[in-house]
């Protein structure tokens, strides 16, 4: 669904494109019937603008807390799919909740 506008994004010369959040993964699969990882990779091939994501605490996939290994895998998959910038925040300012996925993304090139 986003691929038809990829050329417009490329021509707009944005500084960065915010790509994905947990709810977008759910909506992409449940309502649009698309593979969100495939969509990121296809857009990465068409758009040279840096991609970024903002993750909320240790809730990478939804609004429930995820185990550390899931958050680390999430960071790895984001980087391998073409995400260059990963930001994270925690509503309680408990940054231990954000460190695993950030370190994983950094280790894999984001």
Name the predicted role of every residue range.
Residues 16, 20-110:
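Active-site beta->alpha loop and helix N-cap motifs at the rims of alpha/beta catalytic domains
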Residues 2-9:
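Short catalytic helix/loop segments, enriched in acidic residues and glycine
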Residues 1-2, 67:
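General structural signal for secondary-structure boundaries
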Residues 10-14:
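Feature activates predominantly on carbohydrate-active enzymes
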């Amino acid at each position: 669904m986003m691929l038809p506008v990829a050329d417009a994004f490329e021509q707009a010369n944005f500084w960065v494109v915010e790509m994905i959040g947990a709810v977008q993964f759910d909506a992409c699969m449940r309502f649009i019937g698309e593979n969100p990882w495939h969509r990121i990779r296809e857009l990465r091939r068409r758009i040279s603008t840096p991609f970024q994501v903002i993750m909320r605490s240790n809730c990478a996939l939804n609004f429930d807390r995820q185990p550390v290994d899931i958050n680390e895998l999430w960071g790895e998959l984001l980087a391998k799919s073409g995400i260059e910038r990963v930001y994270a925040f925690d509503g309680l300012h408990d940054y231990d909740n954000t460190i695993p996925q950030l370190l994983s993304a950094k280790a894999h090139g984001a």
